Amino acid sequence: MRRLVSILLALTYLSCTAQGDFNTPNLRESVKVETSIYTVWYSETKEQPIRLVYKSSNRPKNVDRGSMNFYKENNYHTSDNADYYRNVWDKGHLAPAATFSDSNQNLKKTFSYLNCALQNQYLNRGQWRLLEEQERKWDDEQELVVTITVKFSDSILPTKANLPSSFTKCIKFTVSNETRCYTFPNSRPDKDWREYRVN
């Protein structure tokens, strides 16, 4: 009888673990992850990136994103497709897919949920995208080091992901040593990207 109880307890534990019920106590406030194209500080408790750094260096465009989808990484608790389902939040790349279209391997890395933020669809497809395009013009002349910092509101989705309140992108020009920073509220933009500059 005692053996049967032990077996049942073990099966219950394994079942709960498979469903993720035991993951919550081990979630990290911040974990640093280095890839070959970006370094990200990710909050598993918020299910969002909190800071990300990448270099933009005039890479040739050799591949298209096609039907690539975001994917979860092993060993990290991130957001997932449910957080973006039927709402105003886009899966916003922090390190842009178009900047790393020089190889299929690099492009795929940009589709990790570690590189994905809950971003207002009008911001993601509007002024944020236009600033990314401008970065790729600037990096024709000199390499850029781009740092993105994410701030958060108190809003949490029913799916448990925290909503960012703003995104600050600082672009360092490595030759001229100039830095330009832009802060965007996570809402529908009401002005040109240039007007979001804060320094």
Give residue spans per PLM region.
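Sec-dependent N-terminal signal peptides
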Residues: L4-L14
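Hydrophobic alpha-helical membrane context
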Residues: L14-S15, Q105
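Boundary at the C-terminal end of the N-terminal hydrophobic targeting segment
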Residues: C16-G20
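Short, extreme N-terminal leader segments that mark the start of a protein/domain
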Residues: F22-V33
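Generic detection of long, well-ordered alpha-helical segments
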Residues: S30-V31, S43, P49-I50, T110, ...
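Short, His- and charge-rich active-site/binding loops that engage polyanionic ligands
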Residues: V31-D90
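Domain-level detector of nuclease and nuclease-like folds
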Residues: N74-N199
